């Protein structure tokens, strides 16, 4: 049988299997489509978008607009994650952590997953543009999807150990999307405030490597088997944890840049949570260096909690409209 005929036969077999699943187990199929969107990964969307929007308009908040933005952003993130699963379906088969994914188990076909992703992409663009009145945010989401798939998934991920450093920029975009929606509500805009969005972007940018590498240390053999050159695969544990410490330091330092534009609640969280985050990163490095038994997953979990606490504090600060540190110090309040 020729290659073309074999592919056609495989596709027909897959379509028949999925049609049967849908007819006999519709709930399982729905769950499979939800799994394609990587719900846990999308949690970062909520953690980042909402605080950014609240900070962009301190003391005032439009709940409906925030909800609409989160929905539009969710569709964009879900589209990117689904495209990612389609592109990575070959390596997902070789990783124990990902062998239960829908495309590997053939619960959903690659073709149907791609159609699903395209529908979400178009819906996200139209939603943010028309319902959130922000063409800027809609364009940001399209750029993010393209970057995540073509730059990170298809190029960086399989070619360089710096994949998550540069590819992680896609995960920083929710803050830019949320900020753009608020700015676009004002005809004259607030260009002087964009520096805060850039700081929020950089916080997630520097936070992503230690967060991801901690997880990759645990699943090092999985990545190695799949041929993905994550840093823990191509470097020694000591070298990896040293990089984790440096990126953690950069993360905490960048969080301090936002203190003048925030109140004491955020300032306290940035310092206290930052110390805890740094201590855990340093402890992991010292443990590896001294040959002690360590659990990198603890840092992974703490890094999630760290970002959540930091952005929760920023949200509370913004909602309560607490006087900013910059205002307390008598600095230029127009800028801050």
Swiss-Prot record:
One of its GO terms (biological process) is heme O biosynthetic process. One of its GO terms (cellular component) is plasma membrane. Pathway: Porphyrin-containing compound metabolism; heme O biosynthesis; heme O from protoheme: step 1/1. GO terms for molecular function: protoheme IX farnesyltransferase activity. Its main location: membrane. The chain crosses the membrane at residues 63-83, 125-145, 163-183, 197-217, 244-261, 265-287, 306-326. CDD domains: PT_UbiA_Cox10. Its EC number is 2.5.1.141. Keywords: Cell membrane, Heme biosynthesis, Membrane, Transferase, Transmembrane, Transmembrane helix. It catalyses: heme b + (2E,6E)-farnesyl diphosphate + H2O = Fe(II)-heme o + diphosphate. The keyword Transmembrane applies. InterPro entries: Protohaem_IX_farnesylTrfase, UbiA_prenyltransferase, UbiA_sf. It is found in: Cell membrane. It is a multi-pass membrane protein. It is an enzyme of class 2 (transferase). It comes from the Bacteria. HAMAP family: CyoE_CtaB. PANTHER family: 4-HYDROXYBENZOATE SOLANESYLTRANSFERASE, PROTOHEME IX FARNESYLTRANSFERASE, MITOCHONDRIAL. Belongs to the UbiA prenyltransferase family. Protoheme IX farnesyltransferase subfamily. Converts heme B (protoheme IX) to heme O by substitution of the vinyl group on carbon 2 of heme B porphyrin ring with a hydroxyethyl farnesyl side group. Carbon 2 of the heme B porphyrin ring is defined according to the Fischer nomenclature. This is Protoheme IX farnesyltransferase. It comes from Corynebacterium efficiens (strain DSM 44549 / YS-314 / AJ 12310 / JCM 11189 / NBRC 100395). The gene is ctaB.
């Amino acid at each position: 049988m020729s290659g073309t005929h074999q592919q056609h036969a495989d596709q027909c077999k897959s379509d028949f299997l999925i049609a049967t699943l849908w007819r006999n187990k519709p709930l399982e199929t729905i769950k499979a489509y939800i799994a394609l969107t990587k719900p846990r990964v999308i949690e970062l969307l909520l953690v980042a978008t909402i605080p950014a929007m609240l900070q962009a308009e301190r003391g005032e908040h439009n709940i409906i607009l925030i909800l609409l933005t989160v929905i539009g952003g969710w569709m964009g993130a879900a589209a990117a994650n689904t495209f990612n699963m389609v592109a990575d379906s070959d390596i997902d088969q070789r990783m124990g952590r990902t062998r239960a994914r829908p495309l590997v188990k053939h619960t959903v076909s690659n073709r149907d997953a791609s159609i699903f992703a395209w529908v979400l992409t178009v819906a996200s663009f139209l939603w943010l543009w028309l319902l959130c009145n922000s063409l800027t945010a809609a364009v940001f989401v399209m750029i993010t999807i393209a970057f995540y798939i073509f730059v990170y998934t298809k190029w960086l991920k399989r070619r360089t150990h710096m994949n998550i450093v540069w590819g992680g920029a896609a995960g920083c975009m929710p803050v830019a999307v949320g900020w753009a929606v608020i700015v676009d509500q004002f005809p004259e805009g607030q260009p002087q405030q964009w520096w805060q969005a850039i700081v929020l972007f950089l916080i997630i940018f520097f936070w992503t490597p230690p967060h991801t590498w901690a997880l990759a240390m645990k699943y090092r053999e999985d990545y190695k088997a799949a041929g993905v050159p994550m840093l823990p695969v191509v470097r020694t544990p000591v070298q990896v944890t040293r990089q984790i410490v440096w990126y953690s330091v950069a993360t905490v330092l960048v969080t301090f840049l936002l203190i003048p534009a925030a109140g004491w609640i955020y300032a306290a969280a940035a310092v206290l949570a930052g110390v805890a985050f740094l201590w855990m990163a340093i402890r992991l490095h010292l443990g590896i260096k001294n040959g002690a038994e360590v659990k990198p997953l603890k840092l992974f979990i703490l890094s999630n909690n760290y970002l959540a606490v930091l952005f929760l504090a920023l949200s509370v600060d913004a909602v309560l409209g607490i006087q900013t540190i910059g205002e307390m110090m008598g600095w230029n309040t127009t800028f801050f």
